[in-house]
Structure formats: structure tokens, C-alpha cells
Amino acid sequence: VPTTATQRAQYEFIHETLQHGTTALNFTLSLLEKSYKFHFPKYSSNVRATLQDACKHLLAADNGRELYQAAAEVHERFFAAGGDGSWFSEGYSAYKSRRKPVQDFENFADAISGSSVLDFGSGRGHLAALIGRAGFDCYTTDVMDYRGPEATHLPFRQMASPVDVPYADDMFDSAIVKTVLHHVDEPHVIPLLKNLRRVARRLIIEEDTYGVSDMPLKVTANQSELTQFSKLEESVQFQALVLIDFFGNAVAQGLIDMNFGCQFKRVNEWHSIFNSIGLRVVDTHVAGFRSGNVHKACQVRFVVDREESSVKA
């Protein structure tokens, strides 16, 4: 069962979203079906039935506590190695360790400033290892030491709290914060950003974001997923981001104890937060539903630099 009050509240919220966000759920399922068929073409005939069965089990949960158990059972039954989900688990682990880090690095490389880089929320370290191989001095941190063998040579410090950035002031030219902030609980978002600003002159932040329809859409204009997403009411866009995140982490990967902070924001909300703490927005790029991602969401990359007058603020 969910062990903390925060986790119980998060699962109740996700349960409500699943039960009442029918439009968002339909969008999420069609997004996943299209993506899984594209990434796992050998098994495309299994995909729709698997998603429908998974969804039926999740919707049968009567409350957040039951949804927590259902997510674990659905993962084991349909997505884990050794069972009916071997097709998914083998393909996904290859993607996560090989293709995904290369794509992620390509999406960030042009924005990295200087030579020292912090990968904040580094996980297994696949991306950090590539950053190191590209000639940067790459440092890592996360709430737990999840590093795989390719990243064990990189400096790592474990975070002592959800807002801790355990490195010295001004230590980095750039910090990469990839789809981390929406997993942070609301009271921690600004303290964490202030700590990141303390250690790095530039932050390269990628977030699952909604309310992007008034942004200039260059390369993304022909993404059918983004067109469909932008037609949804903003409240439904938010629900879809919640469901995509829950499905991609708890259901597909079995990460049922992940902190689902659900801090999804509009582009203009992120801009106001950055401005309020002395971070100047250098670039905002709507990447949208990147075709290379298995679990796609509407992603926006923000490049923000510290206003030098605010170092000690």
C-alpha cells in the first residue's frame, strides 16, 4: 500500500484523473498505441489489446490504494520481463540504455555553456556518461545512487533531501534538469531552483508542459500529436500529462513508488517562476511530442541564465 500521506494523496489524485478524465485518457491511450506500434513493430498486433486490458484493470480500482496495487499487478502481467510483457521490457530496456541517451544528448548539446556540467537527477547515468564522453567534466546527483556500470567513474553525490543540490556554490557552468521538476512536490519547486541557480550559471531545463498553443512552433508544426493536444482544453491537457507520466513510469516501468508531484505548468507559469528568482530566459523551445521517445509528452526546453546580481539573493 502507499506508505506516506503524500503518496496516498498522489494516488488518490491520479485515481480521480483516470476515472473522470475520459478525454485525457483516450488521448493518452491513442498516443501510447501509436508509439508502441512504431517502436516495437514486430509486436504491433499485441499493442492495442495489451493497452485495453491494462486500462481495464486500472479503471477497476475503486480508490488510490487499489490503484497503487493495480499498477504493480498490471506492470508484472503486461510489461515485465518473463511474462506476457517480455516484448515490451526487452525492447524498452534497449531503448532506455542506448537510443534514448543519444537523443537526449542531441537535444541538450547546443545549449551547454562552458566545460563543467551537472546532470541533476541523473538516474542510471546513461546521459551523464555520454556528456562525459563528449569531453565535458560531468558530475551527477540523485535521491538514490541508481548508476549503472558506464557511469560509476563519474563523480556522484547523493541528495540529502528533495531540494538538496550537494555541490559547492558556482561549481558548474551548466546544469541539466531533464523532466525532473514535475516530480517535485509543489513547496519544493522554488527552493530547488534556487539551489540549482546557486551551483550553476546556466540551467537547461526540459519539462512536460501544456498551454503551448501561443508559442512559435517551428519544427513541431507538423506533429499530429501536438495539433491534437493543443485542441484540448487546458485542463484536459494537464490531465493528459498526469496520465502519460503515471503510465510511462508506474505502469510500463513498474516505478510505483516514484514521487508523482504532478507539477505540470504552462510555459508562461515557468517563465514567471524563473523571472521571480533571478533567472533570465535565454531560449524557450517547444519540442513537443518527440518522435524518438517511447513515452511522449509535450516537451519544452528552457535555457535560463543566472542574473549575476542575484547570486547571493
Which residues does each predicted region cover?
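A conserved beta-strand element that flanks and buttresses the S-adenosyl-L-methionine
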Residues: I176
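Conserved class I S-adenosyl-L-methionine
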Residues: G114-G123
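Class I SAM-dependent methyltransferase SAM/SAH-binding core
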Residues: S122-D164
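A short, conserved alpha-helix within the catalytic core of class I
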Residues: V184-N195
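Short catalytic micro-motifs in class I SAM-dependent methyltransferases
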Residues: T179-H183
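Glycine-rich helix-loop-beta junction characteristic of Rossmann-like nucleotide cofactor-binding loops
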Residues: E106-S113, V165-P166
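C-terminal alpha-helical "lid/dimerization" subdomain adjacent to the S-adenosyl-L-methionine
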Residues: D208-I277, V282-G292
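N-terminal accessory regions of S-adenosyl-L-methionine
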Residues: V1-D104, S113, L217-L241, A252-D257, ...
